[in-house]
Structure formats: C-alpha cells, structure tokens
Amino acid sequence: MKRVNSCVKDEEHVLEELETEGERQLKSLLQHQLDTSVSIEECVSKKKSFAPGTMYKPFGKEAAGTMTLSQFQTLHEKDQETASLRELGLNETEILIWKSHVSGEKRTKLRATPEAIQKRLEDIKERISERQRILCLPQRFSKSKQLTRREMEIEKSLFQGTDRHSFLKALYYQDEPPKKNKGDPMNNLEHFYRETIMKKRLEEFQLLRGESFACHSLVSAASVSGSGTAEKPSLLQDKGKQAAQGKGPRLHVAKLIDFPTEQYWTGPKTLKQPIEFIPEDEIQRNRLSEEEIRNIPMFSSYNPGEPNKVLYLKNLSPRVKERDLISLFARFQEKKGPPIQFRMMTGRMRGQAFLTFPNKDIAWQALHQINGYKLYGKILVIEFAKSKKQQSAVQRSSLITSAPDGRTEINGS
C-alpha cells in the first residue's frame, strides 16, 4: 500500500494544462478526419459549393511574332482583363459588349436594340459589384469557429506571455457586432424605456418621502486645484440651478476622466436612481470623535484647520462613489440655496474628495456631524481645506526652524 505524503505543499502540485479554443478546434478536425464510421449517405448529404468552371485561353498566339515591350505589356493587360471577365461567367458576346462600352466604341456588327444592350450592361455591372463585395470579405478557413468578444478575450489571455502557433489563429475568429444605423429611432428605444421607468420610480419615492426631492440637486466639479477651490464654479452653479428648476427630480454629478497630462471637463451626468440617506443615529453610532481619531497613529497630528466653506475628505475607501457622499452630505443642502459641489479625485489623489458648501457655518456643521464616520470599513477623516497662503506658510514652517543660538537651519537641503 502506498503511503500518501501529506506534507506536499500546494505550490508543488502540477497545474492542469488549459486547452485553448484553437487547440480544441484542431483536435475536433483531427477526430473528424480520422473517423472511419461514415456512410455514403452522410457524404452525399453534405452540401458542397464549387466555383463555376471557366474557359482557359492560353496567352501565346496573340503574342507571337516581333513586337516592342510596350506593345507586349498592353496586350498582356488586355488578356488579363478578358480572363477576369471570363471568371464572372460572361460569354464572348457579353465580354465584347462590355469592352465596347468601356472604350466607347460603336460596333456595327452588333444588331441588338439599345434597350437589350443596356439591360445586359446592367447585369454585367451587378456581377462585377458582387465579385468586388466577395473579394472584400475576410478570407477564413471553412471550419473556423466564430467566437464572441468575451471568448476571444479569454483566448488571448491564455496565450499571454507564451508563444502561439500561427496556424491556430486560422481556426477561430471574432464575430463582428451588427452596425447600427445612426438615424434609426429604434436605437433610442432602450434609453427612452429606462428613463420612463426610472422617472416613475422617482415620483413614487418622492411621494413616500412627502417632500420635494428637487431641492437635493447636487453638482460635483470635475477637478480641483492645489488650493482646494473649484474650477469653473459659476458654470456648475448655473447648471445646478437649471436642474433644480426642472420638472423631474434629478441629481447631477460630474464625471472626471483622468489623463496623464491634463484633465478635461465632461459636464454633469444625471443620477436617476433614488438615493437613501443614512440616518443620523446610525452616523453617531459608527463615528469616532476627534480624540479617538488622534489615537490612530496615521492621524496623530490631526487638526481640523480654520473654518471655511470647503471641506477636504481623505482616507476614502476605493469603493466610495459620488452617491455614497450624497447619502451622507445631502442633508445639509438648503432648499433655496446653491447646490453643494462634490469633487471626487482620481489618479494619484484617489481616495480624496472636496466638498464646497454655500457658507462656512454649514461646512462646520457637516464636519462635526460626519467626521470620523466608518464608511466601507475605513474612517472618514474631514478637514477644512487650506488656501494657497496657508499651504505656503505650512511649507515654509516645515523647511525653516530656529536653532537655540538664534541661527536659522533649513531642513532637507
């Protein structure tokens, strides 16, 4: 009886080799080729289409004799043109009609009516256009398998970092999504249906609350400068007022696209889903005081700063979205006041946000009620944003310190 070694680590187990779609397709083709249990009826039942046969006329008699190089090239080009017309299934009469039509020559030997000749020319044009369409189609193996976009992504990920045989690529291809006509009204059917359903749900939610939800129209800015002031505040406030005066209850939140060199303003987007506000008693149960925040080593030097209307939020969880901040701070929105501006940061400043309130009193109230709240497992730390003068003063104080003998020392130089 064999002894089983229970001390073998998981890393020592041999991983099962993954079979890709190309290898699976190649194996099925091989099994189909080696299968000998095939009857004559099955072979006959398979439909096979072949290209129609054409007449081959060797190029030699016309080129016999002495001629210049330019004459030979012209003769060879005409012969190639005639051969391509024969591949379309045209007979000699139709080839003659087409050549005379292209060259503009009138042949007296053709005794057909102009209507019949025009009909034949239209038929030839259709054959030529159909051949061009077929030639433009992608050339694929007859047994190649069509994969969806997700299957193609999985297939590419399996080959990541390894060499792939080139012939395996011919065994599958990605399906192309159908092209939508821009002028087709059916393209907007899904958007119209979604907007109608969400509007009805918001109206029901508004009736249940018993208050106008339009007063909570909140606008978040797209980017923040180093001083903590919003870019284009007048533009945001105007759009927020227009949204508040509208008929439908909507929440406007701007979206930020992070680029390596600069940031672009994309305008406000509409949140049509109802947002549930977090109750105040739940916030009080799940928040830390300022002393408890200072007991955390990371925030031992926590200081709220000088009160102003801009709050700086940090230590945000990556799961926090705009709607989460709205559920916390929308309670401080005044019915007839300007909208609160939310600015979610991305890139290197991910996990931070700036909130601009109508005045510093509301900002102070929001800080003392929400600061220290545990949101998605992380403590939300709030401070008053610093102006440019305060930031420069803090930098100077951190670089310049006074020695006991009155000399001035510069740290970090």
From Swiss-Prot:
It comes from the Eukaryota. SUPFAM superfamilies: RNA-binding domain, RBD (SSF54928). One of its GO terms (molecular function) is RNA binding. Residues 309-387 form the RRM domain. Pfam families: RRM_1. Keywords: RNA-binding. The lineage of its organism: Eukaryota, Metazoa, Chordata, Craniata, Vertebrata. This is RNA-binding protein 41. The keyword RNA-binding applies. Residues 225-247 are annotated as: Disordered. PROSITE patterns: RRM (PS50102). May bind RNA. The keyword RNA-binding applies.
